Swiss-Prot record:
Outcome, altering P534L: In ECYT4; impairs interaction with EGLN1 and VHL
Gene Ontology molecular-function annotations: DNA-binding transcription activator activity, RNA polymerase II-specific; DNA-binding transcription factor activity, RNA polymerase II-specific; protein heterodimerization activity; RNA polymerase II cis-regulatory region sequence-specific DNA binding; RNA polymerase II transcription regulatory region sequence-specific DNA binding; RNA polymerase II-specific DNA-binding transcription factor binding; transcription coactivator binding
Disordered: annotated segments: 1-24, 460-486
Start and end residues of each stretch annotated as DNA-binding: 26-53
The UniProt record lists the keyword Nuclease: no
GO cellular component, one term: nuclear speck
Organism: Homo sapiens
Entry protein name: Endothelial PAS domain-containing protein 1
Reported impact of G537W: In ECYT4; gain of function; affects hydroxylation
Tissue specificity annotation: Expressed in most tissues, with highest levels in placenta, lung and heart. Selectively expressed in endothelial cells.
Biased composition range(s): Low complexity: 462-485
Quaternary organization: Interacts with HIF3A. Efficient DNA binding requires dimerization with another bHLH protein. Heterodimerizes with ARNT; heterodimer binds to core DNA sequence 5'-TACGTG-3' within the hypoxia response element (HRE) of target gene promoters. Interacts with CREBBP. Interacts with EGLN1. Interacts with VHL.
UniProt-annotated location(s): Nucleus; Nucleus speckle
Amino acid sequence: MTADKEKKRSSSERRKEKSRDAARCRRSKETEVFYELAHELPLPHSVSSHLDKASIMRLAISFLRTHKLLSSVCSENESEAEADQQMDNLYLKALEGFIAVVTQDGDMIFLSENISKFMGLTQVELTGHSIFDFTHPCDHEEIRENLSLKNGSGFGKKSKDMSTERDFFMRMKCTVTNRGRTVNLKSATWKVLHCTGQVKVYNNCPPHNSLCGYKEPLLSCLIIMCEPIQHPSHMDIPLDSKTFLSRHSMDMKFTYCDDRITELIGYHPEELLGRSAYEFYHALDSENMTKSHQNLCTKGQVVSGQYRMLAKHGGYVWLETQGTVIYNPRNLQPQCIMCVNYVLSEIEKNDVVFSMDQTESLFKPHLMAMNSIFDSSGKGAVSEKSNFLFTKLKEEPEELAQLAPTPGDAIISLDFGNQNFEESSAYGKAILPPSQPWATELRSHSTQSEAGSLPAFTVPQAAAPGSTTPSATSSSSSCSTPNSPEDYYTSLDNDLKIEVIEKLFAMDTEAKDQCSTQTDFNELDLETLAPYIPMDGEDFQLSPICPEERLLAENPQSTPQHCFSAMTNIFQPLAPVAPHSPFLLDKFQQQLESKKTEPEHRPMSSIFFDAGSKASLPPCCGQASTPLSSMGGRSNTQWPPDPPLHFGPTKWAVGDQRTEFLGAAPLGPPVSPPHVSTFKTRSAKGFGARGPDVLSPAMVALSNKLKLKRQLEYEEQAFQDLSGGDPPGGSTSHLMWKRMKNLRGGSCPLMPDKPLSANVPNDKFTQNPMRGLGHPLRHLPLPQPPSAISPGENSKSRFPPQCYATQYQDYSLSSAHKVSGMASRLLGPSFESYLLPELTRYDCEVNVPVLGSSTLLQGGDLLRALDQAT
């Protein structure tokens, strides 16, 4: 029994030994086969001898697939193959990247040996592995799109459907540091690779070896060259003369540019700062550059293809740009974009204009020649060269269109000295009947000889110290300024004169004297003043802060200057107008000659409220033409002129009693100072349907005074009924009794000589309408001899702007109690001897009658309405 057991045990052990020996033999044979297979790989012996079986299998399969690809694509000519073998080492040295062959499934079947130089990973470590194991997960979808072969037209972009070429960017793991050291794969960083190549299609086996007559599907692989993008801070090789650096914001606006761009493309670095790089790309390359910009923002680095950048003086150059996003080391946020620009060619098609920036060089030589016209300082030379300039621009209309202003630019009027090119007005004169020339027309004829001798481009002259006319309306300026709104229209169809309006906006609007500057300041203050409502029943308004009050207090004998107003800006004359226009004077002289007797005195109501009167009350002051820009962008309300007031001819027939104020002087036709200009009288009916109902501030003030008079007369009658006609007691009642007495006797106290408001005419006749109508006007200025009149002035504008500049005295209060200025009016008593309420700008804006003066609340009615509302 024991012998049998030993035999069985020995047999099993023998079988085990045999199996172990067989396995050992198989492993040795397998190792021998793998060893032989490893030696068959195109690898050095030092590398292949240390490979494990899995690596040998992976590399062998990759080699076989690569060999099949090469055999189906490349030629079998050995001579060419030998030449390629000799050039292999030179290729790798010349390339700035490595070669990779990736199958449709993503397996990297071939990688060049120099991959370790750029990525740190060796060829053996990566060959046979999937590309998705070493690339960024966000790039996998893009990699799959580039690996697949699209046959249908409904897939992807048209460019990929029609071509097998590929150009994309991917991020791959890199184990080499900036200093050249190699780290572990777990510590690897992402490096952007620019992959360019094409898709190759090949068969898996020859057609005659196909199984059962079925053809195997076509195999495709992607052959690409991967070029890593070098970081700008790690460039060791200095840039050549055909390369320049630039820094941009994240939206590709220039923040820095190298000086080399000037000699390469023509731009100066200062011209590019703040401008987008898209402004200088060729239109056909803008789509590719937009895609490159998107890749740059998503992946951090990009290399643009060859694109065209427009040169400054026409044409373009071919460029290639490497862009890198610089991140903030603190918060890892993108900070800017650094670009290395390689100029690949010279300027091509430099005679072709591709953008508006390149048009400057075409006109610059001509413009420089034109600028030389104005180098000479002589008047004759300027006149001749200005004619040459007009002829030059007329011959070249394209150049004239280039010099035309764009919307928003200032309009600068060009005056060529002699007006030989103006449109003739014979057409309008042939239709309209001849009329008597106005004063402005006579003046234009008298100054025509002087205008011909002026230079082509004149500088506005400063006005005289006593003149309130801006320099744009002086006689020394070559620009003719309209004096009335009718001058802005032609005589045929009342169309606006374009050339006159252009001159209006082109003239110098700066104030030349101190009065106009201070007046603008006062108008600014008026905007912030609140209306003053007294509590004692007397509705007197505050007067604006005018600098003339201080001047009048110091020099009572001097003629007060007029405050300018913002109510008359463009549609009012630019200078103070003579109170008695020649048209008005001629009219009254004709009436006096026809009657030969002194007419009867009309009642006050008929004088001031005659709606059908054609004579207008001469305004005391005008307004300088000031555009909105000089007022700080504030809107300036344009007001129509006051309705005409009719004065009786008797006010003008008493010229023999004027020697009392100024002394004796020879009689003659009255004249106006040189700064006074006349204008054609406008009718108040030309401003809408309001017509005669529109009252001027002076007329409103007069009506208020008449109401006050009636109220005081009623109170006086009440006092007489109570006290039997004796003056009532008390200071307030005593003053009221004095006022009623003065009103009854016709010798009411007048206001001190100061301007009531910037918008109310400072006319003593309107301030004292209750004066006896039979009293002569004794304070009219004497006429000047004809020799004192300047030849350029109008012979018909005679009267000075202030015919009633009389220094009246207030007899109701002593000089110590006379108040002046804003502070004194606030602190002083409200029963001051002002019988004419002062109107401010707010009164004129709020109390403008709309349908008639009868619908407005005034005085006590207004106070009662306000009390009921509150």
